[in-house]
UniProtKB/Swiss-Prot annotation:
NCBIfam families: reco (TIGR00613). The keyword DNA repair applies. Keywords: DNA damage, DNA recombination, DNA repair. This is DNA repair protein RecO. HAMAP family: RecO. GO terms for biological process: DNA recombination; double-strand break repair. Coiled coil: none annotated. It comes from the Bacteria. It holds the Pfam family RecO_N. Belongs to the RecO family. The keyword Nucleotide-binding does not apply. It comes from Bacillus anthracis. Involved in DNA repair and RecF pathway recombination. The gene is recO.
Length: 248
């Protein structure tokens, strides 16, 4: 059976001397993998469509196991991302998180649209770190994780938030922050932005400017929470941390 899908390449794996296994997150089927025979050959008709982060239409011969990529038509190569090491690093984090967080052939058009919109914004020049924070926040419910972003994790009141508790699974107010000695102190902006990112429609994203110190706190909150409850190891996250460390 042949299936035509619109999708974005989120992973490629070399297979033999000339082939690739291409993993595509599609609007119609969710995540699907297919053998792209001869894709490593420079003159192959599949060489360009099998590049990481390529957005296109793909014709796949489906089977009980791994499908076969027959042909593809490029919608966008995301060249702005490919030509910039910082954009490549953040986009790689986004597509790897998508890959690790999803199962094969689980239809999720909402997630496809979120992935596409995030990469599209990145190509348009929106802060890639902010986009990665938004994406990481919005992936929480996809992974079945629902931290307390709206109320204190202990008293469930909407009040002043001064810390984030991984143990309690959310923000803590000033009255209950002392109950977790390992809490992460945060500023008011961290709570407001994480709450906003969790709920708002990504299509409505306008001009966004976030202080470096706030982004650093948000990253710490999200990474610590993911480490505790998700168990996903991302190579791209390590590279991002190295970029930040050496300020390349």
């Amino acid at each position: 059976m042949f299936q035509k899908v619109e999708g974005i390449v989120i992973r490629t794996t070399d297979y033999g001397e000339t082939n690739k296994i291409v993993t595509i997150f599609s609007r119609e089927l969710g995540k699907v993998s297919a053998m792209a025979r001869g894709a490593k050959k420079p003159k192959s008709r599949l060489a360009s469509v099998s590049q990481l982060m390529t957005h296109g239409h793909f014709l796949i011969q489906m089977g009980s196991g791994l499908g076969t990529l027959q042909q593809g038509e490029i919608i966008s190569t995301m060249k702005e991302i490919r030509e910039d090491i910082f954009l490549t690093a953040y986009a790689s984090f986004i597509v790897e998180l998508t890959d690790k967080a999803t199962e094969d052939k689980k239809h999720n058009p909402y997630l496809f649209e979120m992935l596409y919109q995030t990469l599209h914004y990145m190509c348009e020049g929106v802060d890639p770190e902010v986009l990665s924070l938004i994406y990481q926040t919005k992936m929480l419910p996809v992974l079945g994780m629902r931290p307390y972003f709206d109320t204190c994790a202990i008293c469930h009141q909407e009040t002043d938030f001064v810390a984030f508790s991984v143990r309690e699974g959310g923000f803590l107010c000033s009255r209950h922050a002392e109950q977790d000695q390992y809490r992460i102190p945060v500023g008011e902006a961290v709570h407001k932005l994480l709450r906003l990112f969790y709920h708002f429609d990504l299509h409505r994203l306008g001009n966004v400017s976030v202080k470096d110190s706030t982004k650093k706190q948000m990253r710490l909150v999200l990474n610590t929470y993911y480490d505790e409850y998700c168990g996903i190891y991302l190579k791209s996250r390590r590279f991002l941390e190295q970029l930040d460390k050496f300020q390349i």
